[in-house]
Amino acid sequence: METVTHGQVLARFGHALSDATRSRLLLALREAPGYPAELADLLGATRQNLSNHLACLRGCGLVVAVPEGRRTRYELADIRIRHALDDLLGLVLAVDPAACPDAAENGCC
């Protein structure tokens, strides 16, 4: 097994967040686990596109696939990811002057 540095781990996390669809997907999974078809509809993405993003997030270790019979449910790999996303989102909304002021109350943006 290859050992990675803290910088490499953070770079992988940054790569996961660098795409708006992946970021929205992580935020959706922060709320609840989901199935690919439902997540694609929620995000307005094609199933193929969503599948590619889920593969990326799995490769980064942020998301896991849980087989359920003939379906697969996706969820965050660790509860700490949810807390990290909450903290990161709160920080970014606090310091970014372009952030939507209604995001925290309305769950938009």
Model-derived segments and spans:
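N-terminal helix-turn-helix DNA-binding core of bacterial DNA-binding proteins
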Residues: 2, 8-46, 68-81
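Alpha-helical residues within the helix-turn-helix
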Residues: 41, 58-59
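Solvent-exposed, charged/polar functional surfaces in cytosolic regulatory/catalytic domains
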Residues: 20, 57, 87, 91
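Residues within the DNA-recognition helix of helix-turn-helix
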Residues: 53
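Amphipathic alpha-helical dimerization/coiled-coil segments
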Residues: 1-9, 79-109
